[in-house]
Structure formats: structure tokens, C-alpha cells
Amino acid sequence: MKKRSAVMLSSVMLMSVVLAACGGNNNTASNSASNGSAGNSGEVKTVKVFQFKTEIVEGLNELKVEFEKEYPNIKLDIQTVGGGADYAAALKTKFASGDAPDIFSNGGYAEMELWGDKLEDLSDQPWVKDLIPLAAEPMTKDGKTYGMPMNLEGIGYVYNKDLFAKAGITETPKTITELEEAAKKLQAIDVIPFGNAYQEWWLLGIQGISVAFAQQDNVDEFISGLNAGTATIVGNEKFKDWSNLLNLTVKYGQKNPLTTDANTHLAMFANGETAMMQEGNWAQTLVDNITPDMNIGMFPMPINDDAAMNDKLSVGVPANLVVNKDSASKEEAKTFLNWLVTSDMGKEYIVKKWKFIPALSTIAATPEDIGLLGADVWNYVQEGKVYGLQASKFPDGVTQEFASSIQELIAGKVDEAGWEKGMQAGWDKLKK
């Protein structure tokens, strides 16, 4: 559902539906010069950036050129490990080998705690006061800010509106029963309802399973209980519900989901072979690259027949950029981060090139800027119909354990009881 009227993504709007507002004034790129960068001295320094968002690689490399024109004494070395690769393992290898980056990605919450002894306090940076509260939360501890959120993202089912209309589906499903009814209607017009990239561990172990956690009565208490041994995944109703959804997508999906990667399911969707895929609003640019101006939208993943509970989208910060406190180039790293969110060039790339939902109140965007998917996500945020993303609260390595257990369930190697036990065993092995 595309809104034609311009929308300012501001903290004032978010205040009414999520948290109390935080104020902020516009900054300019000139602020960054006050951070002690090498830009005004003769010394040339290199800032090594190690991040995982593969969909922004082209844009980052273009911004690197523009930034280095403005700051000729700062050179950016940008490396990306993402997609199907294990970024967390690669980051640990970087630090262990003595090739630690100056800027790297961090998911916040438990991941912030894990890397706490490497994180520079960024509380004094000019952009901090402009953070939207929802976006600031994952990297805030004891009133201090340790990371710059790249954007807000929503995760759900991306769907082809034209195929839905052709199949006679007039409303997006809000229950698992309605979802199956929609799938049957799509099959009736010879369209594969779901494209499932279940080869991808992150799609299952980070994004998909987040819904089963988010729908707990109190997710933070549940996670604390898992760590303390007072709560369990085994026999938990929400996990059974989620497995029912998983089985439904396999039943109405393409063949061989466990050997289908994200690029394939994106291509199948963009070419009209499938009507739905589990994705986030970052898929907008990826779909546009294959089929420009495709009529698409997003809705939450319903795991049962509680329409009110299911009509909430998983929304949060996918990644924060943090600064290595031991870096010899940390002031230059701060200069780049500030430039990224305060310069006209940086802000343009954030909303127009990457179609990001901004995490700062000083970055304006319209639905036309952020695309149909971003506009749908923002509508859920405005209406207060959101669940937070949960994976950053998990013990390190659990997401891969989860994915392995889920893939065993899909393959039929375990039944539901065995799957739940496998999920619990993965948590117990890695909890602290």
C-alpha cells in the first residue's frame, strides 16, 4: 500500500507510537572536522571498514570516492562479508590475526556485550542526539552510545500485489489459516505461493525464528529464563506455531528449498514465478535491479490464528557501525561516520540509493525515496504494530545452531519434538 503523500521520518512521529521523542538539530558535514581527523594535517591515515550488508557495497564504494575527495588525508579500505558467509566468525578472525578493523558491524544487545571491550564510546558524537529512540536502544548501555545504527528494517513476507489480485486475494493474510487459503488461490492460477531460500542459515536462524521469540508474553524474561534454565523451548506453544508456519511454506513452496539460496528466491520472485518470499525491505533495490517498478508490498508472518498478535511486523536495527577503541585511526573513523549521516551526499545515498528507513530524525525521506517495502514497514511503525528483532539478544553462535536444527526439520531428519530438543540443546550449549 503505497502512500503518495510525503512523509518525514522523524522522531516526533515515532514518539507517538513507540517511545518518547528525542530532539535534534540538523548537523552538517563540517562537524566532522572537529573530531580531530587527519583531514587538516599532512598525515594520511587509512580507515578499515568491515561490514556485512552486501546490498550496499556498490554505494559504499561510490561514497568512498566522494568522501576521499573531501578528506584527501583519509583513505577508506572497505571490506564486506555477508550473504551466506559467517560475518561473526570472519570478524573474530580479523581481530585474532592482528588485522582488526577500525569500523565494524555490531547487532547490539548481547552482541554489544560480547564486543564491549573493543567498543569506543560515541556518546559525544554530533549525530547521537538525533537518533530515533527505537534505533538507539540496541547500542545504548548505562546511558552511553556505542554504535551508529545504519537504519531501521522490517522483516516479513514480501508479496506480489498483482499476483494476489489475479488470484482474488483482496487482503493480506493475518492468520495462518488465511495464509493457507491465499496459497491455495495462488496455486489455482499456477503460481508457486512461496519461494523459500532455506539454504540460507541467516534467513532461518536470525530472521525467521525471531517471530517465535517476539510473540512470547515477555520476550526478555523468556530469554533470561533460557539462560537461567527456568524456561525452555521444548513444549513452548509459540515454537510449535512457528514450525506449523514453516511446514506450510514448504508445502506450498518450490522444490528443493534446502538447496535454494537468496539470489535464486529473489530471481524467482522478481520474475513472477513465486508470489511471496520471506525478506525485508532491503529487498526493494534487489528486486528493482531485476524488475523495476514491480508492484510489491510486505506483511507480517502469521504463526497462528490470533489476528491481533500476528498483525505486527518484526522491525529493528539490522546493524550498527561501531569504532574499535584501540584503533590508531579512530578519530578518522568517527569523521567518516559523521560525514555519512550529516553530509548531503551521505543522506542521499541512505534514502535514495539504499532506500533505507533512516535511524536519525535529521534524515528526511518520502515513500518514494524508500520504496514500496520501506513505506509499508514505516506504516507499521507509525501504527505501533511492531515487534523488535530478537537475534542480537541470543548467545553468540546460537543462530547457526538454530538454523541447523530448522534445516533438519525441513529435511525430515527430526520430528517436531526432536526439533524443539535440538533448538534447546543449541541454546544450552552456548548460553553463558
Which residues make up each language-model segment?
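Conserved N-terminal structural module of periplasmic/extracytoplasmic solute-binding proteins
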Residues: R4-V7, C22-E111, K118, E171, ...
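Extracytoplasmic/periplasmic substrate-recognition and gating elements
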Residues: K69-E70, K75, A167, N289-K353
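A structural signal for short loop-to-beta-strand junctions that line the ligand-binding cleft
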Residues: D102, K129-F164, I192-N196, M309-L313, ...
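Hinge/lid segment of periplasmic solute-binding proteins
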Residues: G107-G156, E180, L186, G297-M298
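Short, solvent-exposed loop/beta-turn-alpha elements that line the ligand-binding surface or hinge
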Residues: D121-E137, A214-D241, N289-T291, I303-K312, ...
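Extracytoplasmic/periplasmic solute-binding protein
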Residues: Y146-M148, I155, E180-A231
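Conserved C-terminal helix/tail region of periplasmic/extracytoplasmic solute-binding proteins
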Residues: A165, A364, Y380-K432
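Glycine-centered hinge/linker elements that transmit conformational signals in sensory
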Residues: K185, A228-L258, Q424
